[in-house]
Design a protein with these regions (language model features):
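Juxtamembrane helix-loop boundary signature in multi-pass membrane transporters
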Residues: 17-76, 80, 192, 198, ...
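Signature of the 12-TM Major Facilitator Superfamily
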Residues: 6-10, 33, 110-113, 175-178, ...
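Short amphipathic alpha-helical coupling elements at transmembrane boundaries
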Residues: 1, 9-12, 138, 210
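Interfacial helix-capping/hinge residues at the ends of transmembrane alpha-helices
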Residues: 8, 23, 82-86, 164-165, ...
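Alpha-helical transmembrane segments of compact multi-pass small-molecule transporters, enriched
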Residues: 11-25, 118, 122, 159-160, ...
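Membrane-interface interhelical linkers
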Residues: 1-3, 44, 51-72, 76, ...
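Membrane-helix interface motif
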Residues: 78-97
Length: 219
């Protein structure tokens, strides 16, 4: 771990502006001034919620360069990847015969399957390069962990990613990416109920600001 989960989440907020920028460059998408303000307000709320620790928990701003570069790459890559996924679905949709237009609704799931195959190839290559097959085998033998991992894979990379691609079918990638960046807000209540994690006023404030920012997209 180079920069920690909170800084990692903060760098991931680069995804919405990256998606908006490259959506404009590649797809010609435009956002209204109100939508851009909504994006800024939403990301501000997320930032406040992520850095919810009190004064007794000091946060060092002296981050390693490699961690910063990986964080920026992750955030920008997430945004650009969403734009490229939409481009791929647009090309495929344009090639579908008129009598098969009903299959358009299945495009996000087909695109998710393609992304999953590519991801699997990438992870296998990474395991080969780093020589971690023994640790991978040990993880597979942990039944409880594999059970939870299976459910996490089903709800996240399958259902979550498919719905995210469905979202970009019907709205601009910048708006869809901003809504997807709300994960740190959505996990506040489950983390409190399931793991008894205390909820601070800064988390609540960040959630309220984020909800207000999202509302600007729809009013």
């Amino acid at each position: 771990m180079l920069i920690g989960s909170r800084f990692g989440q903060l760098f991931m907020t680069l995804a919405p502006p990256s998606a908006a920028l490259f959506g404009w460059i590649i797809l010609g998408e435009t956002l209204s001034v109100q939508a851009l303000i909504g994006m800024f307000v939403t990301l501000l709320g997320i930032g406040i919620s992520v850095f919810h620790k009190g004064s007794s928990h000091k946060i060092s701003l002296k981050l390693p360069l490699s961690g910063i570069l990986f964080g920026i790459g992750a955030g920008v890559g997430q945004g650009v990847g969403l734009v490229l996924s939409k481009m791929g679905m647009n090309y495929y949709e344009a090639s579908i015969p008129k009598e098969m237009t009903d299959s358009i609704t299945m495009l996000p799931f087909a695109a998710t399957f393609i992304r999953a195959i590519t991801g699997a190839v990438g992870f296998i290559a990474l395991l080969c390069v780093r020589g971690k097959w023994q640790e991978f085998g040990q993880a597979l033998r942990d039944k409880r962990s594999m059970h939870m991992t299976w459910w996490a894979t089903f709800t996240g990379p399958f259902i979550g990613v498919a719905l995210s691609l469905m979202a970009v079918q019907y709205t601009e990638t910048g708006i869809a990416s901003t809504l997807m960046a709300l994960t740190p807000i959505f996990i506040i209540a489950p983390a409190h109920w399931c793991f008894k994690q205390p909820v601070t006023y800064k988390e609540v404030l960040g959630a309220i600001i984020s909800v207000f920012g999202v509302s600007l997209f729809f009013i």
